[in-house]
């Protein structure tokens, strides 16, 4: 009892090889704390590993592995048979080269490739399909003669355009015309008054510049000649003098134009070219929006009403240039 059958020599050799590999593997795998930080092996572990690997390589080179013991290290065939390498003699190598050269020379030439032709467009004829044999039916069908478009076209009556911009432009042009007429009338009267005052100052001494009609009994405050208010008898005489001065200016201008007809044409052309260039440069700086133009004109008018005489002259010239450029632009 308790006796076991005797193990054969092969079994003992396998068990001995496994014990040897277990001992070698134990020396290869470090145990315990590796270092103080637990990351790197010590020098003793490295030396044990190097010594064990040298012993394993020596045993593998000598073929001393026992049968079946190689599976512990993943070696399925510890002593593989070497594959015999072919040995070529110089004569055999020369013969192989000559045979390959003759093959290249006797090889048939490559055939030239033909470019692929584009496929002919396929078109269905009435005789190709029995459903389309009766061509007259297709030609006489109303849908064949007048095919409907893929997208239906809906015809709508044209909408009448609203004339709001034209109405606004007409009102704006009327306001601008009234404004220009007002400014021109004021400036013409101012120029005529200055000429009248200069005429009176030449014909009357400086001490007698008071109006002679203010002592006729009317309750009028003292004033100078040429500045007669409404109600003074000299008011009509003042505007009569202004009218006479205006007629004289027109007569002088007409005489100059009549005497220098050709010169006036040349001067007119030169002046018109310079004025057109000035107006074109000013119109390029004007805003295109009509509301902005109205705001600009009324802003200049406000400055003109609340400023001195010198500023009024400059603003008036600016307004006239702006309005003229606006008409030139339109």
Swiss-Prot record:
<feature type="compositionally biased region" description="Polar residues">
    <location>
        <begin position="76"/>
        <end position="88"/>
    </location>
</feature>
<feature type="site" description="Cleavage; by host">
    <location>
        <begin position="240"/>
        <end position="241"/>
    </location>
</feature>
<feature type="transmembrane region" description="Helical; Name=TM2">
    <location>
        <begin position="239"/>
        <end position="259"/>
    </location>
</feature>
<dbReference type="InterPro" id="IPR000349">
    <property type="entry name" value="HBV_HBSAG"/>
</dbReference>
<dbReference type="GO" id="GO:0055036">
    <property type="term" value="C:virion membrane"/>
</dbReference>
<keyword id="KW-1161">Viral attachment to host cell</keyword>
<keyword id="KW-1168">Fusion of virus membrane with host membrane</keyword>
<comment type="similarity">
    <text>Belongs to the avihepadnavirus major surface antigen family.</text>
</comment>
<keyword id="KW-0519">Myristate</keyword>
<dbReference type="GO" id="GO:0046718">
    <property type="term" value="P:symbiont entry into host cell"/>
</dbReference>
<feature type="topological domain" description="Cytoplasmic; in internal conformation">
    <location>
        <begin position="2"/>
        <end position="238"/>
    </location>
</feature>
<dbReference type="Pfam" id="PF00695">
    <property type="entry name" value="vMSA"/>
</dbReference>
<keyword id="KW-1162">Viral penetration into host cytoplasm</keyword>
<keyword id="KW-0946">Virion</keyword>
<dbReference type="GO" id="GO:0019031">
    <property type="term" value="C:viral envelope"/>
</dbReference>
<keyword id="KW-0261">Viral envelope protein</keyword>
<feature type="region of interest" description="Disordered">
    <location>
        <begin position="68"/>
        <end position="125"/>
    </location>
</feature>
<feature type="lipid moiety-binding region" description="N-myristoyl glycine; by host">
    <location>
        <position position="2"/>
    </location>
</feature>
<comment type="subunit">
    <text>Large internal envelope protein interacts with capsid protein.</text>
</comment>
<feature type="transmembrane region" description="Helical; Name=TM1; Note=In external conformation">
    <location>
        <begin position="166"/>
        <end position="186"/>
    </location>
</feature>
<dbReference type="GO" id="GO:0016020">
    <property type="term" value="C:membrane"/>
</dbReference>
<feature type="glycosylation site" description="N-linked (GlcNAc...) asparagine; by host">
    <location>
        <position position="262"/>
    </location>
</feature>
<feature type="region of interest" description="Pre-S">
    <location>
        <begin position="2"/>
        <end position="163"/>
    </location>
</feature>
<feature type="topological domain" description="Cytoplasmic">
    <location>
        <begin position="314"/>
        <end position="330"/>
    </location>
</feature>
<comment type="function">
    <text>The large envelope protein exists in two topological conformations, one which is termed 'external' or Le-HBsAg and the other 'internal' or Li-HBsAg. In its external conformation the protein attaches the virus to cell receptors and thereby initiating infection. This interaction determines the species specificity and liver tropism. The large envelope protein probably also assumes fusion between virion and host membranes. In its internal conformation the protein plays a role in virion morphogenesis and mediates the contact with the nucleocapsid like a matrix protein.</text>
</comment>
<keyword id="KW-0812">Transmembrane</keyword>
<feature type="transmembrane region" description="Helical; Name=TM3">
    <location>
        <begin position="293"/>
        <end position="313"/>
    </location>
</feature>
<dbReference type="GO" id="GO:0019062">
    <property type="term" value="P:virion attachment to host cell"/>
</dbReference>
<comment type="function">
    <text>Truncated S protein may be involved in translocation of pre-S domain through the virion membrane.</text>
</comment>
<dbReference type="GO" id="GO:0039663">
    <property type="term" value="P:membrane fusion involved in viral entry into host cell"/>
</dbReference>
<keyword id="KW-1160">Virus entry into host cell</keyword>
<feature type="topological domain" description="Cytoplasmic; in external conformation">
    <location>
        <begin position="187"/>
        <end position="238"/>
    </location>
</feature>
<keyword id="KW-0325">Glycoprotein</keyword>
<keyword id="KW-1133">Transmembrane helix</keyword>
<keyword id="KW-0449">Lipoprotein</keyword>
<keyword id="KW-0597">Phosphoprotein</keyword>
<feature type="compositionally biased region" description="Basic and acidic residues">
    <location>
        <begin position="92"/>
        <end position="109"/>
    </location>
</feature>
<feature type="topological domain" description="Extracellular; in external conformation">
    <location>
        <begin position="2"/>
        <end position="165"/>
    </location>
</feature>
<protein>
    <recommendedName>
        <fullName>Large envelope protein</fullName>
    </recommendedName>
</protein>
<keyword id="KW-0945">Host-virus interaction</keyword>
<keyword id="KW-0472">Membrane</keyword>
<feature type="topological domain" description="Extracellular">
    <location>
        <begin position="260"/>
        <end position="292"/>
    </location>
</feature>
């Amino acid at each position: 009892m308790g006796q076991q059958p005797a193990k054969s020599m092969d079994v003992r050799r396998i068990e001995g090889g496994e014990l040897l590999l277990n001992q070698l593997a134990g020396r290869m795998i470090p145990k315990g704390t590796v270092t103080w930080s637990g990351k790197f092996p010590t020098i003793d572990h490295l030396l044990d590993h190097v010594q064990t690997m040298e012993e394993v390589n020596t045993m593998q080179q000598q073929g001393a592995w026992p049968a079946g013991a190689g599976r512990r290290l993943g070696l399925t065939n510890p002593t593989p048979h070497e594959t015999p390498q072919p040995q070529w003699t110089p004569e055999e190598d020369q013969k192989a080269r000559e045979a390959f050269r003759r093959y290249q020379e006797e090889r048939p030439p490559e055939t030239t490739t033909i470019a692929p032709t584009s496929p002919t467009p396929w078109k269905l004829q009435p005789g190709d399909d029995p459903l389309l044999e009766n061509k007259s039916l297709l030609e006489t069908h109303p849908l064949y003669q007048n095919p409907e478009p893929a997208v239906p076209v809906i015809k709508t009556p044209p909408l009448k355009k609203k004339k709001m911009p034209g109405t606004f432009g007409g009102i704006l042009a009327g306001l601008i015309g009234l404004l220009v007429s007002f400014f021109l009338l004021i400036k013409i009267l101012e120029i005529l008054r200055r000429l009248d005052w200069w005429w009176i100052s030449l014909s009357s001494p400086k001490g007698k510049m008071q109006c002679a009609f203010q002592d006729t009994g009317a309750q009028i405050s003292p004033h100078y000649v040429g500045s007669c208010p409404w109600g003074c008898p000299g008011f009509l005489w003042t505007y009569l003098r202004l009218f006479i001065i205006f007629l004289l200016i027109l007569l002088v201008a007409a005489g100059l134009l009549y005497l220098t007809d050709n010169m006036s044409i040349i001067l007119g052309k030169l002046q018109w070219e310079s004025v057109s260039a000035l107006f074109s440069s000013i119109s390029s700086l004007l805003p295109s929006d009509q509301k902005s133009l109205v705001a600009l004109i009324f802003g200049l008018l406000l400055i003109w009403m609340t400023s001195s005489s010198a500023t009024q002259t400059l603003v008036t010239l600016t307004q006239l240039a702006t309005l003229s450029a606006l008409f030139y632009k339109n």
